[in-house]
Amino acid sequence: MRLLLAALLALSGPISQALAQDFSLTIKDHKFDPAELQVPAGKEFTLKVVNSDVTAEEFESDDVEKLIAGGQSATITLGPLDAGRYEFHGEYHEDTAKGALVAK
């Protein structure tokens, strides 16, 4: 029994690290929240974008364009990214829907 418990505890480290690679953003009132999100450099990760507005919005950057209907969400796999700042915006509300991923 102790051996099983030790094995489960040893495995929980990699599991929690995998879970730490999932991030989320919310679109509300045509703004991204949080507006800046820190992500790991050099690793692939998933970004869930939840659109809480009733109207559609796009999550758009130099390399990604994803339309998200009002009240819906989308999961995007990104990376690996070099260390740096990667800006994104919402195409339909560019004046307010702005943000950045900061890879460290």
Where are these regions (language model features)?
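Bacterial N-terminal signal peptides
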Residues: 2-14
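N-terminal edge beta-strand
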Residues: 20-42
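Beta-strand-rich interaction surfaces with strong enrichment in secreted/lumenal proteins
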Residues: 35-37, 63-68, 77
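Asparagine-centered strand-capping/turn motif at beta-strand->loop junctions
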Residues: 49-51
